[in-house]
């Protein structure tokens, strides 16, 4: 699901925008970027990183200009990914992303007084590493996103495709391929 999320780094007087790409099934954050502008570049960079970790069958996002522009949609088409977009103003079409944003805000952003963009980038990066590797989820049977992401069996796929993935600016939907060449150790070290 693609939706912009505004983060106010106290002390800078400006807004920062966060995009994240997550696996719906495991809630694993595959990639994320922070920007002080709403241009598409930071969203495309996050998508490029996520695509290096696997190719989804379907990518679902909202209709924000970052996600409807040629740079973003062209990259998806280039990789043979089908594009799906939610209805305008339909935040409930991607509850997993909305839940991620709530969690990030209440467990990280609102508790910190970022002095600048660098502080926000470091804090959010640390939080996503914690979120993936250490934060259990009730919906995942009290396992972490990393535990579930790594344990997705090939038998659970159809045609080599895992059942789900998502991305959003604060996240956009993304389905990934379970490729044998996928190096889980390199994903967890990011």
Regions found by a protein language model. Give the residues of each.
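Charged DNA-binding/catalytic regions of mobile-element recombinases
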Residues: 1-190
């Amino acid at each position: 699901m693609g939706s912009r999320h505004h983060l106010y780094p106290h002390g800078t007087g400006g807004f920062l925008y966060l995009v994240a790409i997550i696996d719906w099934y495991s809630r694993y954050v595959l990639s994320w970027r922070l920007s002080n502008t709403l241009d598409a570049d930071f969203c495309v960079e996050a998508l490029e990183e996520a695509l290096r970790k696997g190719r989804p069958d379907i990518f679902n996002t909202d209709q924000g200009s970052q996600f409807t522009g040629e740079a973003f949609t062209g990259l998806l088409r280039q990789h043979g990914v089908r594009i799906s977009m939610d209805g305008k103003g339909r935040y409930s079409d991607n509850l997993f992303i909305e839940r991620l944003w709530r969690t990030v805000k209440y467990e990280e952003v609102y508790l910190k007084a970022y002095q600048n963009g660098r502080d926000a980038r470091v804090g959010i990066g640390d939080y996503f590493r914690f979120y993936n590797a250490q934060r259990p989820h009730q919906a995942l049977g009290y396992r972490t996103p990393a535990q579930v992401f790594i344990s997705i069996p090939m038998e659970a796929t159809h045609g080599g495709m895992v059942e789900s993935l998502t991305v959003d600016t604060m996240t956009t939907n993304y389905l990934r391929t379970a490729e044998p060449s996928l190096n889980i150790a390199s994903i967890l070290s990011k």
